[in-house]
Amino acid sequence: MLSYRHGFHAGNHADVFKHLLLCLLVRALLAKDKPFFFLDTHAGAGRYRLGSEMAGKNREFESGIQKLWNLGEVPESLGTYLDVVRITNPGRDLRWYPGSPRIVRPFLREQDRMVLC
């Protein structure tokens, strides 16, 4: 059986697409007072170090989050996603890429639940 190590792919174009959509979905859920439940059945690491040997092998993040990191003005939907990525990266440098749990966590209200497997 082949093993999958997300550290090689963290922050690539697919992660950006998936996590941008996740931000939009969670924001839509927050429009109502009703609580929401987030279940991640394939939760990996909470964050991925982009300077690691794994991430450096193919440097897939360069065609994903790195292209967006230093953009100036962006649409609100993209700005929300980038704000969440910035929470994981205090300072100006892009060093870490958040996994889905860290993408969702800043949006959670007291009544919402998150379960990671």
Predicted regions and their residues:
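Class I S-adenosyl-L-methionine-dependent methyltransferase module
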Residues: 36-37, 45-117
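Short, conserved active-site loops that position catalytic residues or coordinate cofactors/metal ions
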Residues: 3-4, 40-45
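Class I SAM-dependent methyltransferase Rossmann-like catalytic core
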Residues: 1-33, 49-63
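Gly/serine-rich nucleotide phosphate-binding loop at the start of the catalytic core
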Residues: 32-40
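Generic structural signal for well-ordered secondary structure
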Residues: 15-19, 41, 97
